[in-house]
Amino acid sequence: AAETIIGEGEHRFRVQHHFPQLPDRFTWQTTHGVAVDAAGNLYVIHEGQKELKDHPSIFVFDPEGRFIRAFGSEFQGGGHGIEVRGEGNEEFLYISAYQGVKCFAKLTLTGEIVWFRKAPMEAGCYAEGENISTKPNWSRQGFLPTNVAFLEDGGFLLADGYGSFRIHRYDKDATWLSSFGGEGEGKGRFQTPHGIWIDRRAGREPTIVVCDRAHDTLQLFALDGTYLETLNGFGLPANIDTSNELMLVPELKACVTILGPDNTPVARLGRAVERLDEIKNLRTQPDKWIDGQFVHPHDACFTATGDILVAEWVQGGRITKLARV
């Protein structure tokens, strides 16, 4: 088949939809997150159907997309966010899970649990018993964490993107310290703060970037949580990654955007927003998906060589590799 190339200028990519191959014994049940380790291996988390309890939620592939291993049935039914962090000579996975699983955890790259945490009741914003409940609570008194971002001191930030709409700060031992945000109309308040990242690109003070998804914006904060500014012009931005001078923004509205050093778009990849309007529930109809067009990008990350991996919130799952041309 002819190659599909998308992008513009210096940012052109060869599209490989359905890049990693799952063994027949597993199925993708709504892919949610992607991350890569130092060796270039790919980690994918899917939500998973809670009825299929013994099915893994995390899948590992080599840089060519060949299956290595799977684990994480404890997150099945709520698997959401995944990030890889180097700590000394080791690397670890940080997992966020929502729905009835509603927890976050630190794992080794082979799936052993280092620690496992539920709602931080000391934050004072959660319903009684939220840390032991296994029913999703979609109110602002619920805990439904979506993604994490890593701080220099070994601690991290956790976005409670579907629950309290707060950003929680933890130390390196996963002890809760403080939080900021909550529900509101912007400028430090959120509607679905779904994604989070620390922007450490050169030539600027490090900033916290929060995907304020339902407002179609990115909000920027100083590392102490002080609100700085808002970037507009997105379509349900879901998460963030950075590499060199670029920032990557997967948008649920059928687009993966690359921002340059001044945070203006330098490429909008696979954008097909009109198609979402034309075809109801396109996410459930793979026969209507078009090569080189996205449906619902939910997470994306750069590889060390500047390729991009994209996870889409679609039925049956889809992980696309965009190989730099």
Regions found by a protein language model. Give the residues of each.
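Eukaryotic scaffold repeat domains enriched in small/polar residues
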Residues: 1-325
